[in-house]
């Protein structure tokens, strides 16, 4: 046990944690040079392209330290993005230590801080590492000071390295071995294993990545998953040295995989506890699960519809397959008058939503229409009952509503001093309430309470463009508060198009209605009859635009001649147009739904 070290790497996006992981694997000889490739642990093509880590991965490596002993080190790679913070907390609770990787040229950023506090809260030993010191603009002294100011851990001893060139990586491992304690736990106790991650493999079913806290696990053992009580027979256990290697047993302190012929991922939830089933000789089930398991609740909802209605079944299958790998994704079928059959999907945040959409389009070749993302509102009806509304079309009539509560989140923003003014303006424009403001070296930390609905649309993009990409943020849910929000409906020729409805704050509902209507006028193609586009709040029309009809010049064949002849032709045309307008329906192009997402303030 004394020679085992479990650690993960915490870093902001692009501070080089995947590259550092590659170097550590290379140094320990986990893969031969031929098998080595950049970002070995990021196995999804989207992960590679965007340079982000989404799913947690592991590598069990052997390292011969300077003191001559061979250490068994388990590296657990974690995502850095705030949307995936649950995955991070699971990975961290499986470790005794974490390397805090900070880019020496950029200093500390928001998500590093969020994940680092999470690590300190879980009692994990944090070892600061300064990366990218080969860059000419690297300033390690300033970065050390920032770590001390912002996070409050001693960084005077921080190891410097360059993951790209491999400089100083051995020192990082030595420091980690010296400072991180070995795992506690007893191989003789009843089995308790934490599921860090689980994914679906087409050949063997669900693969669970577990950290054995107490006890031992061997093939042919019967195991029980404590959250839902289902039992399964273990077929294989082993470790990843990034490649999977079968082992005869996994014992306390180790991290490895378990394959037990589980058919669906919903059974093996991340954060659940695995133990032995009762009634086996010499195997005692654990009396209680490990702490910290919670169901992940989606924060952002959007409708996904296939462009071709015939692809509905295919979309359902793709979502099922995707859910096998992404337990945080929720979906349920819904019907829209404008878009036909589709699904209402729940996501952890905006990045998660983009990635799900991209994976559906890329891995499963779907063509999708996405409706505007919304958050969950709590509506207290006049009858006294409270309902949750995650879809504008489910919002009851205004007369039946007492109060509407909207989710408020606490947002921490970090940015260089020169951008503070413009970021504050942005937050105030989004109905933010400033809670706190700290100067930390050259960085500023702003804390705001903002309605989640304002963040969902375009807050992130705006924040990045105002600050030229230097500002970073993380948010967490605080509470529900009463809010004066209204539903804006878009009517086309007097008919409501449910997929275009949005819920917005009353103060900017009129302007929002006007903008959407103006945008729709440019997008909806001209028909043979006039098309009226209106924005309505309840029964009040707040904006209207017309798309003029295309018309044939019916007088072309009359040269000169009597006015009554011309009038007859014009009247006849007018009658025809009127009749068309009664029966005609307007095709709403795909862009119209996207336009709603990009309405500028």
From Swiss-Prot:
The gene is lepA. Keywords: Cell inner membrane, Cell membrane, GTP-binding, Hydrolase, Membrane, Nucleotide-binding, Protein biosynthesis. CDD domains: EF4_II, EF4_III, LepA, lepA_C. It comes from Polynucleobacter necessarius subsp. necessarius (strain STIR1). This is Elongation factor 4. HAMAP family: LepA. Its main location: membrane. Belongs to the TRAFAC class translation factor GTPase superfamily. Classic translation factor GTPase family. LepA subfamily. It comes from the Bacteria. It is an enzyme of class 3 (hydrolase). It is a peripheral membrane protein. Required for accurate and efficient protein synthesis under certain stress conditions. May act as a fidelity factor of the translation reaction, by catalyzing a one-codon backward translocation of tRNAs on improperly translocated ribosomes. Back-translocation proceeds from a post-translocation (POST) complex to a pre-translocation (PRE) complex, thus giving elongation factor G a second chance to translocate the tRNAs correctly. Binds to ribosomes in a GTP-dependent manner.
């Amino acid at each position: 046990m004394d020679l085992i070290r479990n650690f993960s790497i915490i870093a902001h996006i692009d501070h080089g944690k995947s590259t550092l992981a590659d170097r550590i694997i290379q140094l320990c000889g986990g893969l031969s040079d031929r098998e080595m490739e950049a970002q070995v642990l990021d196995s999804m093509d989207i992960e590679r392209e965007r340079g982000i880590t989404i799913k947690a991965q592991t590598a069990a490596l052997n390292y011969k330290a300077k003191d001559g002993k061979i250490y068994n080190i388990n590296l657990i790679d974690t995502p850095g993005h705030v949307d995936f913070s649950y995955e991070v907390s699971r990975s961290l609770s499986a470790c005794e230590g974490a390397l805090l990787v900070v880019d020496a040229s950029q200093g500390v950023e928001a998500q590093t801080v969020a994940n680092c506090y999470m690590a300190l809260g879980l009692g994990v030993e944090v070892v600061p590492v300064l990366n990218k010191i080969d860059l000419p603009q690297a300033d390690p002294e300033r970065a050390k000071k920032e770590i001390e100011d912002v996070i409050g851990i001693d960084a005077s001893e921080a190891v410097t390295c360059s993951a790209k060139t491999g400089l100083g990586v051995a020192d990082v491992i030595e420091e980690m071995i010296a400072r991180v304690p070995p795992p506690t736990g007893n191989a003789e106790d009843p089995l308790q294993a934490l599921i860090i991650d689980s994914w679906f493999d087409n050949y063997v079913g669900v693969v669970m990545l577990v950290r054995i806290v107490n006890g031992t696990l061997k093939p042919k053992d019967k195991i029980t998953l404590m959250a839902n009580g289902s039992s399964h027979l273990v077929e294989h256990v082993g470790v990843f040295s990034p490649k999977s290697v079968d082992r005869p047993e996994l014992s306390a302190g180790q991290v490895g995989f378990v394959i037990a012929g589980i058919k669906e991922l919903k059974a093996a939830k991340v954060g659940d506890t695995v133990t032995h089933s009762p009634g086996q000789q010499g195997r005692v089930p654990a009396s209680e699960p490990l702490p910290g398991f919670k169901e992940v609740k989606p924060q952002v909802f959007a409708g996904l519809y296939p462009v071709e209605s015939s692809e509905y079944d295919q979309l359902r299958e793709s979502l099922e397959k995707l859910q096998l790998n992404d337990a945080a994704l929720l979906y349920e079928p819904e019907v829209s008058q404008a878009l036909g059959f589709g699904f209402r999907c729940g996501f952890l945040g905006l990045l998660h939503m983009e990635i799900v959409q991209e994976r559906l389009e890329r891995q499963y070749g779907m063509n999708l229409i996405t409706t505007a993302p919304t958050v969950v509102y709590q509506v207290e009806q006049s009858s006294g009952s409270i309902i949750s509304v995650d879809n504008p079309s489910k919002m009851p009539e205004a007369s039946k509503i007492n109060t509407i509560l909207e989710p408020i989140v606490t947002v921490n923003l970090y940015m260089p001093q020169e951008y503070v003014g413009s970021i504050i303006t942005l937050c105030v424009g989004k109905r933010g309430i400033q809670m706190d403001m700290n100067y930390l070296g050259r960085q500023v930390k702003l804390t705001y309470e903002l309605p989640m609905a304002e963040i969902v649309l375009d807050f992130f993009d705006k924040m990045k463009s105002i600050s030229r990409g230097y500002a970073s943020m993380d948010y967490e849910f605080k509470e529900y508060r009463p809010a004066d929000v209204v539903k804006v409906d878009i009517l086309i020729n007097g008919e409501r198009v449910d997929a275009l409805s949005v819920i917005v704050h009353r103060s900017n509902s009129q302007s929002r209605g006007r903008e959407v209507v103006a945008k729709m006028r440019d997008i909806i193609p001209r028909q043979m009859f006039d098309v009226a586009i209106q924005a309505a709040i309840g029964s009040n029309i707040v904006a209207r635009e017309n798309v003029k009809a295309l018309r044939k010049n019916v007088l072309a064949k009359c040269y000169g001649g009597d006015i009554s002849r011309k009038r007859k032709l014009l009247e006849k045309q007018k009658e025809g147009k009127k009749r068309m307008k009664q029966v005609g329906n307007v095709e709403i192009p795909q862009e119209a739904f996207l336009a709603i997402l990009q309405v500028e303030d």
